Curated annotation (Swiss-Prot):
This is Lysine--tRNA ligase. It comes from the Bacteria. Its cofactor is Mg(2+). It comes from Streptococcus agalactiae serotype V (strain ATCC BAA-611 / 2603 V/R). Homodimer. One of its GO terms (biological process) is lysyl-tRNA aminoacylation. It catalyses: tRNA(Lys) + L-lysine + ATP = L-lysyl-tRNA(Lys) + AMP + diphosphate.
Amino acid sequence: MSNQHIEELNDQQIVRREKMAALTEQGIDPFGKRFERTATSGQLNEKYADKSKEDLHDIEETATIAGRLMTKRGKGKVGFAHIQDREGQIQIYVRKDSVGEENYEIFKKADLGDFLGVEGQVMRTDMGELSIKATHITHLSKALRPLPEKFHGLTDIETIYRKRHLDLISNRDSFDRFVTRSKIISEIRRFMDSNGFLEVETPVLHNEAGGASARPFITHHNAQDIDMVLRIATELHLKRLIVGGMERVYEIGRIFRNEGMDATHNPEFTSIEAYQAYADYQDIMDLTEGIIQHVTKTVKGDGPINYQGTEIKINEPFKRVHMVDAVKEITGIDFWKEMTLEEAQALAQEKNVPLEKHFTTVGHIINAFFEEFVEDTLIQPTFVFGHPVEVSPLAKKNDTDPRFTDRFELFIMTKEYANAFTELNDPIDQLSRFEAQASAKELGDDEATGVDYDYVEALEYGMPPTGGLGIGIDRLCMLLTDTTTIRDVLLFPTMK
């Protein structure tokens, strides 16, 4: 460490380094060694929740805990402090005559943020707080910087996102939210595994973007001297596995899209995609509803949930409505009727629906009407199905009306949570759809993809009728933690 760096330190940091040096002089490693604890704060609080001060005195139970020193008070020969571990905090009561003079000095000189190991007797104070009466203190690790806003938690939004470690230390609500996120992902896996799905891994680096309509991140592979893209979906590789006979597969992983950022979008996000042979989009609706209701029940319990003051009846059967019917209900316009592109464009102009250059079919305009008028009305869980074929290049056409596909999206609180369909397994039709997407790309549609000839070739070997699904896990985490911004459910969101 240079003298220049030492001079830049503030007074608190200098004092902490002096204490670090003093520990070394005493033969104590400032950054500790392995420590065996017998209990966490949560285990102790649960085990002794119904024990009185007298009960604990009689049973003389001992415990060894470890964690970060969060508060400390007292002077002279007696001190109180709170130790924080992954499950919460527990108070320690330290007396000089119980731990000895030398050991008491370790406690006395410990700074907030230091890690301590505490061995002692479980007790309850006169105020009724469960505590550990220390018989020995072990220094485990020195914190060379003071914690932010000692008693009130970290509140600066920029710091919360840039320095998540400080947020987790200071804000228990934030810590618990990310524990819930992990539980959500674990329960998704549990549900999928119990329903016979096999978890697999597919490449993050692709030669061609595909499986979704999105702008990719482009990178360069130096060894092979080729440009590659970060995946915008896992779909096409997973469906190759269906061709290969795996029948039920899923992947939970990061997806990368080089697009805008807002309260519900981050350039990298987590999704689950799943594919089931011999199923159609109706089966996948049932699967989607099952996943979300299972996870919600496990994490939040039975009954509806509350999101930002609105009751969401996530425990009840989800509504199912065709896109054309949804548009008709809100606008009165009936797109079931056959009409020319010019007639549809006139209706769009009449209703002030923005039209893009690549909206070259009635299907594009139906989708634009839906996005303009319907999405913001979908509060309760709703499956919207029957998307136009032009905006669904990987979905199978509907047998009854081939203008539309056997596709659905799940909306809750006006946001899309899932996208799924009966997969297109006709390689000739698939090639035609890819070529239409390539044409749209040439007309300025940045989200359109090119032709994946390798995938078309895979389909030519035969893929069974298949249903597929994608769920945005980050949005589901937002819903189940009552959070309004995606950054609050991403440990390390993208920052400038």
